[in-house]
Amino acid sequence: MVDIVDKALRMGEGRQIKKLEHVAEAVNKLEDQMVVMSDDELKGQTAKFKERLANGETLDDLMPEAFATVREVSKRTLGQRHFDVQLMGGAALHWGNIAEMKTGEGKTLVATLPSYLNALEGKGVHVITVNDYLASYQSELMGRIYRFLGMSVGCIVTGQKPAERRKQYNADITYGTNNEFGFDYLRDNMAWEKNELVQRGHHYAIVDEVDSILIDEARTPLIISGPAEGDVTRWYRQFAKLVLKLNRDEDYEVDEKKKTVGILDPGITKIEDYLGIDNLYEPSNTALIGYLNNAIKAKELFLRDRDYVVTGGEVLIVDEHTGRILPGRRYNEGLHQAIEAKENVEVKAENQTFATITLQNYFRMYDKLAGMTGTAETEAAEFMGTYKLGVLPIPPNKPMIRIDQDDLIFRTKKEKLAAIVKDVAARHRKGQPVLLGTASVESSEVVSSLLDVVEIPHKVLNAKQHEKEAAVVAVAGRKGAVTVATNMAGRGTDIMLGGNVEFLADAELKAKGYSPDDTPEEYEKLWPETLKKIKEQVKDEHEEVKKLGGLYVLGTERHESRRIDNQLRGRSGRQGDPGESRFYLSLEDDLMRLFNTQLVARVMAKGMPEGEPIESKSVSKGVRNAQKAVESRNFEIRKNVLKYDDVMNKQRTVIYSERQAVLKGEDIHEDIEAFISDTLTSYVRGAKNGSDKPADWDWNGLFKAVNDLYPTKVTIDEAKEAAEGLKGDKAVDAVVKLFVDDAEAQYEAFETKLGADGLRTLERRVVLAVLDRKWREHLYEMDYLKDGIGLRGMGQRDPLVEYQREGYQMYNQMIEAIKEETVQLLFHIDLDSIAQTNDDGTDSIDDAAVDSAEIKMGDDVSEDDELNKGNLSEHEPEEAARIDNHADELETAENIAAVKEAAEEGERIPESGLLGPEPMSHAEGKVPARKRPKSEELKTPWSDGRTFPGTPKNAPCPCGSGRKYKMCHGQNEQ
């Protein structure tokens, strides 16, 4: 099926390439005109282009001249002239495509063309790279072109303060990593003041190594979190010790493919004996099951120096695709704590999610998106389906002459490693540079130790030495160099035969104290001479290495993805240079062991002589099939992550847009009045007890609720009198009007006390406080709903449909809770404590006093919430790496009706938010009719009044709702 889609996507490829060639021809015709321009004339082009845009011309109209201008400026500042294929790549990016350009084709330089062109609109261009170093390096180097043309350049890196970030985002072109851009978006939607915002919109983005960021990283949501309540450290430590006493396959089972574990009956008995409990599955022990499962996962599925490293007493995750450390990122749902307990380091507190978004949904916000990579064609269908991005293969500037040798396959890892060392030694003796690619930190260290034994000098580049990355890669193409590196995917720095000229020149100038940011004039003056000197030094060595066969890439095992294998191979043979690549495999490699067990068993049974490689088409085919199986599985996981996040994305879009409106000063006084009316209406309707006769209503319960909401002056007798002789909606309307008139009269007095501006400020601050608190609680509940939703499949119900339906109900309940709590807060704040008289005699509010009052009220209203505006900034935001495992949940024919029903309900969420003129519905319950589920679905799981004494607050509720106990039946204990 995927092959058919790929063919369909490629049908118009030839026409697109012709169109790109026409752009290159148009630019070439302008080159003579640009060459004779003075520097000042070239600098003046930017103002002319902006004027033409203002007069109605389009970016497409300006493209040939703008590209020709950038090309000429690049020649004068960097000494680099854009090739025709680079012009084609620039046009592809401008039109919102992925330009597939092989390694060494100068993708970084290509990005300058569409970046400059689109920056002319003044809305900002974002260039996304894979790490902070590349963001800084590229913004400095390519920034010389932009600054020459009067454009400002920014760079977002880890550790910058908000004021500095805002300055960088306000630049015409801003470089940074995907995580920095994504987290800034989330932080902006947690800001409390307008001047705390740093981003200014999402106009146009160019994503470098787009497959790494939008495909490989797509399974990991960006999550800003903070410590949750309770200290459960002892449980993690206790279970880390207990699982050491359990035996695999006897006490528990492990599925390495799906990364799941399951406790068996003998294991349950042992755990119950160790803990001194009668039944592990009693409601009061439910939380212990989570600790047990995480401890087993930490023991069996997450290995040190493969999945993580321990540095400075911290467990740091290693990116499985690039081999880089992911600082600040933590596994979610207690798994990271289980690993910390296993490694006997400090177990940090569990986290609660404050804000989250997937990279898929973040990048889909951009008005225009484009990307560059050397390997995108294998994922063309996914790029089109998820991001509406076409893939255009750009022809190389020079033919690729690298020789890709057949794989050598050995029976055991020991035999494979011996053959690798022998091959490297032979290449090193003649001076050919060698790059060894490994799949993990552990593998790289094993290979390094074997090279030490035979005294082959080499450099190691893995998660433990990532600071040296660019420097190591820049010299990996020199004569005799041997480099051992974890996955080279997305490394970003080209391996040039003889050495990377630009990098070496830049490093020499910086060593002398010159940089394009701090000393731009001196740097520019010294650059041509330094570059020329380095080129001369490298030139002879470059030719010598070419004669030796170029860079030899040796893969020590196949990766799960063919695309990442191709990226490793692609480090050799750049710009028409010679090169060679080969992969060494063994039947003990994880890929073969887990995904092609029958083939492995068949080959092993043949009894091959030790040390002899297997050359078999069936084995090579088996490797490809194993990779396809993993790729297919990972694609399903990504699709399901997106499906589930799309539910949250609709809700997040509404909440964040309305939050921004409040933050930026929108007058919400009428909305507050609507909150009062809506909440009181829901109270009165809730008191009806299903009867239209006022005599049957719960008047005492109604007045208790109303008095908790605001200090009403209406009496029960007055309310009964208003409803006398009326029934149904008319009776409700009469009582509601009585309460609303009373509440609004009291509320109007606030304006007299605080002044109009003071009250508007107070309204905004309270709405933000309540919205943030309720949104965090909502994320918390949605997380737990998703964790348990897979079990619905056992009842022949589609888990995704159930998640959509229940998430939709929970969203509506959150909206009503925000209204209710906002009104309650506003009426209970001590106005005397926040009012102040200004020097001119006018009234206003004391901001600090408001903060204090809000926090106090927030604690009163929501006891479970530990974080509020007062201390949120004290907690460093953390990104939790979580892979959602819903890939195996498939729709069945029986679910078609449910799918339609969920679509009808779930798709309407973006139409209904917190702010707006719509009055409260007269339907039964608290939820407006335009978004209210069926009445029987309004019953909450805890409405039966049950409690489960002894259940920990943060444990899953024994009722099976999927919520934590404190958010479910635990509420009945209050």
Swiss-Prot record:
It catalyses: ATP + H2O + cellular proteinSide 1 = ADP + phosphate + cellular proteinSide 2. It comes from the Bacteria. Its cofactor is Zn(2+). Zn(2+) binds at C957, C959, C968, H969. ATP binds at Q86, G104, E105, G106, K107, T108, D494. GO terms for cellular component: cell envelope Sec protein transport complex; cytosol; plasma membrane. Gene3D superfamilies: 3.10.450.50, Helical scaffold and wing domains of SecA, P-loop containing nucleotide triphosphate hydrolases, SecA, preprotein cross-linking domain. It is an enzyme of class 7 (translocase). GO terms for biological process: intracellular protein transmembrane transport; protein import; protein targeting; protein transport by the Sec complex. Its EC number is 7.4.2.8. May bind 1 zinc ion per subunit. Monomer and homodimer. Part of the essential Sec protein translocation apparatus which comprises SecA, SecYEG and auxiliary proteins SecDF. Other proteins may also be involved. PANTHER family: CHLOROPLAST PROTEIN-TRANSPORTING ATPASE, SECA INNER MEMBRANE COMPONENT OF SEC PROTEIN SECRETION SYSTEM. Belongs to the SecA family. HAMAP family: SecA (MF_01382). This is Protein translocase subunit SecA. It comes from Bifidobacterium animalis subsp. lactis (strain AD011).
